[in-house]
């Protein structure tokens, strides 16, 4: 799935889900080290667990963050 982010430095997040587990998570743009680290940490994680852990994280004064945007993308995926 591809998700266009809003309000953060990254422009897009792509990921796949196999057996309710996250795989191939990639961010386009944003802080390279942070987004690579996040992608590696959540590889193989259950999507519901990822949503619980990432939902609502802020980045400085912004009301969202790259992790929060990923949680939103996963929620959208589940609604399909």
What are these regions (language model features)?
Residues 4-12, 17, 21-80:
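Active-site- and interface-proximal helix/loop "cap" or "latch" segments in soluble metabolic
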């Amino acid at each position: 799935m591809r998700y266009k982010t809003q309000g953060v430095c990254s422009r897009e997040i792509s990921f796949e889900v196999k057996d309710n587990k996250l795989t191939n998570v990639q961010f386009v743009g944003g802080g390279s080290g942070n987004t690579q680290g996040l992608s590696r940490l959540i590889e193989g994680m259950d999507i519901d667990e990822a949503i619980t852990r990432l939902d609502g994280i802020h980045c400085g004064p912004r009301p969202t963050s790259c992790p929060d945007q990923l949680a939103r993308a996963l929620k959208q995926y589940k609604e399909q």
